[in-house]
Amino acid sequence: MLFAVYMIDKLGMEAVRAQTGKAHAEYMATNEEGIRMGGPLYADDHKTMIGSVVIKDFSNRTDAENFIKNEPFNKAGLFETVMINPFKAFVDN
């Protein structure tokens, strides 16, 4: 089942994002199976990262919660908000 994981950064956490970026990339590479799409969210300036989104196939919501619980950005306290919702792809190129 697809879930969208939508994560918004706390304000003023740019240094944490930069310091944790390598661990985040390694975590995503290790857990890439089932990822349909993912990447950073940007402010309107198209330069400032303000969060992340991942659309991934999980067996259930608990697996999605465990995935984000162990994600390095989340463990470092980067996120102000984390939303996990079932997702249905109407268009899948």
Role assignments for model-derived ranges:
Residues 1-93:
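Conserved, structured core segments of small domains
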